[in-house]
Curated annotation (Swiss-Prot):
<feature type="binding site">
    <location>
        <position position="453"/>
    </location>
    <ligand>
        <name>Mg(2+)</name>
    </ligand>
</feature>
<feature type="binding site">
    <location>
        <position position="463"/>
    </location>
    <ligand>
        <name>Mg(2+)</name>
    </ligand>
</feature>
<dbReference type="InterPro" id="IPR020825">
    <property type="entry name" value="Phe-tRNA_synthase-like_B3/B4"/>
</dbReference>
<dbReference type="Pfam" id="PF03483">
    <property type="entry name" value="B3_4"/>
</dbReference>
<keyword id="KW-0460">Magnesium</keyword>
<keyword id="KW-0030">Aminoacyl-tRNA synthetase</keyword>
<dbReference type="Pfam" id="PF03147">
    <property type="entry name" value="FDX-ACB"/>
</dbReference>
<dbReference type="GO" id="GO:0005524">
    <property type="term" value="F:ATP binding"/>
</dbReference>
<comment type="subunit">
    <text>Tetramer of two alpha and two beta subunits.</text>
</comment>
<keyword id="KW-0963">Cytoplasm</keyword>
<dbReference type="InterPro" id="IPR004532">
    <property type="entry name" value="Phe-tRNA-ligase_IIc_bsu_bact"/>
</dbReference>
<protein>
    <recommendedName>
        <fullName>Phenylalanine--tRNA ligase beta subunit</fullName>
        <ecNumber>6.1.1.20</ecNumber>
    </recommendedName>
</protein>
<keyword id="KW-0547">Nucleotide-binding</keyword>
<keyword id="KW-0648">Protein biosynthesis</keyword>
<feature type="domain" description="B5">
    <location>
        <begin position="400"/>
        <end position="475"/>
    </location>
</feature>
<keyword id="KW-0479">Metal-binding</keyword>
<keyword id="KW-0820">tRNA-binding</keyword>
Length: 802
């Protein structure tokens, strides 16, 4: 929600400085996200006159201009490429050292094609006050040379942007924001009575509402004989300041009412509407060319406004092109209605339309302001466009529901810990539009029609506390007896913490992604079941609970790549959902590596760059399992993985055939294509819930490390085995010979080719033998070696390579 300071002061009589108002807005729950002060940003830019503009000696499209900057000094030489640069032109000048916001550069003295340039003549786009970049700005001939441009152009009206929570629909208009500030002692609220505009004739257009649940109320008025042209300068500046494009007076009035009073309206060109209007559900096969230039396919779930020819408007979301108002409009129908919030939200998400009207209607508008909003809009139309108004046509209810809450004043202390005097409670609630009656400990509080979010006692406490001051809430620690146990993390919480630390220590950056993903992505990763669909998704592309963390991480990696950061390693630890039962929800640790983001380091390097591969993903997964306390000696790594992984470049980590702990490998190209991501991409995912808990020990102390005083011995073995034999089987066989003496078995060579029979391969291992009690003799070492050969032969069918 954006507004200017002067706009706010139309509704709030205040002398408070902007920084004080911004601080108070945040304190009362209307968080200020940004304040844009163009006067401050454009302070260095001045008004200047071009004295002469000569052809550049070395460029056809450049001119060498001598510019009078108004400082009393000699003219300044500026090289300019604008087609409208000419002698006598008054424009905006920036001197060296000035920051140009539209180009994100700081200007310096430069030489352009051999000619020195000591400044710049600016376009409106370079000052970020419009998108016009076809030429430098042209100011009136009487503009004061040397004056500050921002001050002369009256740009000293800061634009404030606030972040609204979904329940504060009343503050989607400047009027509601001013009311809150007045209640917080920031000024006096201006709330003049809206006088009805007397109709001069009956409205010839009738309105029928077929389904009152979709449209509880509808008001309409015809104004004849209007002259629709550009809106007044004050209105155009106000709309431009908040990022809206002025179109014409009638359309600008509806946009102004939307932001000023949180009352979306719609105007129809009455001459383009055939017959009467009906509010109904769309019919199968109906379409609408909307004001955004797009054609939408409608269905019976969509509420529309139609005439005898068909659909004219998407109710509460966007009007149709066919009945839109332009400079030829002479008769206008002004519509002010109430719409079903849920239907508006569902229709907007389904059609992918995010309009200002939808933003307000799906949150709920003030039902009692439906008719007064129409009266105020009629008054503005007559002031700007003239015309004769008809009488109002009102269908349905034009008022809000009466809500009176029995409120014990002690609730404020009970829920917030603050002692607020009862007179102060009444003052706050009264300024917010509530009515409080009764002297006793339980009072009656009447809720105003515009506060559709207030339904109970806790809501009233919230209103009182946020205005009184959340900074006054005392810090009260929970009481805990002397014999109370200190908090202890669960095994899963410990694994989660250790997994994060392990991955961070490997140079991977933690990311937090949505728990919701698209239906197509969910199906790709084995999800997409009906029970995992979100009943009321916040966006059409966030419809399903995620069966994996990888969908979000891959999207995040691609987003980084699209912005020029292709070498990225990301991880996330969070919940995944295989079903809607508690036992179908798991804690997972997942990660992606892209480009040169290998375990050797990130990005390219002069000493050589290593592309991330599946062994990096494997090492990441094993690091997580080791940190989580998995029995590493019992892990089995099986080639292959889920269908979304490359079949020849992936693996599955398991303990036995039933307990699959995770996967790693390269994403399948088809899966990446379906996700709209570029490859190759290395990924892993470990399910922390499936890691077996370590056996409990009688003491928490770790056993002492046993260091041997004797020299270790290493022996190399090369075995010829079938091609299908896994290296891990050979390693486990060798380790099992003597677990006290053999402290390490590593694979250092795999060979297939000349000298090896077809269907066979050679795997070489290094076995480390660590004596504990004495130095081993050659005979003892050879005995261990013989056992290694025998055990590997027995378990794998391999033979010692000659």
């Amino acid at each position: 929600m954006k507004f200017t300071l002067s706009w706010l002061k139309d509704h709030l009589e205040t002398d408070e400085p902007l920084d004080r108002l911004a601080e108070k807005l945040t304190m009362i729950g209307l968080e200020v996200e940004n304040i844009e002060d163009k006067a401050k940003a454009l302070k260095p830019f001045t008004i200047a006159r071009v004295i002469s503009a000569e052809q550049h000696p070395n460029a056809d499209r450049l001119r060498v201009c001598m510019v009078d900057t108004g400082d009393g000094g000699a003219p300044v030489q500026v090289v300019c490429g604008a087609p409208n640069a000419r002698a006598g032109l008054v424009s905006v000048f920036s001197a060296p050292g000035t920051y140009i916001p539209g180009k994100d550069i700081t200007l310096g003295v430069g030489t352009i094609r051999g000619v020195e340039s000591r400044g710049m003549l600016c376009s409106a786009a370079e000052l970020q006050i419009s998108n016009d970049h076809d030429g430098i700005m042209e100011l009136p001939a009487d503009a004061p040379i040397g004056a500050a441009y921002a001050e002369w152009a009256a740009l000293g009206d800061p634009v404030v942007e606030i972040n609204l929570t979904p329940n504060r629909q009343d503050c989607t208009g400047v009027h509601g924001i001013a009311r809150d500030l007045a209640a917080a002692d920031m000024g006096k609220f201006k709330d003049p009575t809206i006088k009805p505009v007397k109709g001069e004739f009956p409205c010839p257009v009738k309105v029928t509402v077929e389904d009152a649940t979709l449209c509880p109320g509808f008001a309409l008025r015809l104004v004849r004989g209007v002259k629709n042209g550009p809106s007044p300068e004050w209105l155009q500046k106000r709309l431009t300041a908040i990022g809206l494009r002025p179109i014409n007076a009638l359309v600008d009035i509806t946009n102004f009412m939307t932001y000023d009073r949180a009352r979306p309206l719609h105007v129809f060109d009455a001459r383009k509407v055939k017959g009467n209007l009906v509010v109904r559900r769309a019919r199968d096969g109906e379409t609408l060319l909307a004001l955004d230039g797009r054609t939408y396919n409608l269905d019976p779930a969509t509420c529309v406004i139609a005439d005898e020819h068909g659909v004219e408007s998407l109710a509460g979301i966007m009007g149709g092109e066919a009945s839109g108002c332009d400079e030829n409009t002479t008769d206008v129908l002004i519509e002010s209605a109430l719409w079903n919030e849920i239907n508006i939200a569902q229709t907007g998400r389904k059609l992918g339309i995010n309009s200002d009207a939808r933003y307000r209607f799906e949150r709920g508008v003030d039902p009692a302001f439906m008719v007064p909003g129409l009266e105020l809009a009629t008054k503005l139309v007559m002031e700007m466009c003239g015309g004769a108004p008809s009488e109002n046509v009102v269908v349905g209810k034009a008022f809000g529901d009466d809500r009176v809450i029995d409120f014990p004043v002690t609730e404020v202390k009970r829920l917030s810990g603050i002692e607020v005097p009862q007179p102060e409670m009444k003052r706050i609630l009264t300024h917010l539009g509530f009515m409080m009656a009764g002297p006793g400990p339980v009072v009656k509080v009447a809720v105003p029609s515009w506060r559709t979010d207030v339904h109970g006692k806790a809501d009233i406490v919230e209103e009182i506390v946020r205005i009184y001051g959340v900074d006054k809430v005392p810090m009260t620690p929970f009481e805990r007896g002397d014999d109370a146990r200190k908090p202890v993390l669960t095994p899963l919480q410990l694994r989660t913490r250790r997994a994060r630390r392990a991955l961070a220590s490997r140079g991977i950056i933690e990311a937090v992604t949505w728990s919701f993903i698209t239906k197509s992505a969910a199906k790709l990763f084995g999800g997409g079941q009906r029970e995992l669909e979100v009943a009321n998704p916040i966006a059409s592309d966030l419809s399903d609970m995620r069966p994996t963390l990888l969908a979000g991480l891959i999207a995040a990696a691609q987003a980084n790549a699209d912005r020029g950061f292709g070498d990225v390693a990301l991880f996330e630890v969070g919940q995944v959902f295989k079903g809607d039962r508690p036992q179908d929800q798991f804690m997972a640790a997942s990660g992606v590596r892209r480009g040169f983001a290998s375990s050797e380091g990130l990005g390219r390097h002069w000493s050589g760059s290593v592309q991330a591969d599946l062994f990096d993903a494997k090492a990441d997964a094993l690091a997580v399992l080791a940190a989580a306390g998995a029995p590493m000696q019992a892990l089995q790594i099986v080639a292959g993985g889920p269908g979304w992984l490359h079949p020849g470049r992936s693996g599955t980590i398991q303990i036995g055939p039933q307990n699959v702990l995770g996967y790693f490998g390269e994403m399948h190209p088809r899966a990446l294509e379906a996700l709209g991501a570029d490859g190759p991409l290395m990924v892993f995912e470990v399910i922390l819930d499936r890691v077996p808990e370590a056996k409990k020990r009688p003491t928490r102390a770790k056993p002492l490390i046993e260091l041997s005083a004797f020299q270790p011995v290493s022996r190399d073995f090369a075995f010829i085995v079938d091609r299908t034999v896994k290296a891990g089987d050979i390693v486990r066989a060798a380790q099992g010979v003597d677990k006290k003496l053999i402290t390490g078995v590593n694979v250092f060579d795999v060979y297939e080719g000349k000298g090896i029979d077809d269907g066979k391969k050679s795997i070489a291992i290094a076995v480390t033998i660590q004596p504990r009690e004495k130095t081993l003799t050659d005979q003892e070492i050879e005995a261990v070696a013989a056992k290694v050969v025998a055990e590997v032969t027995k378990k794998t069918g391999g033979t010692l390579r000659a």
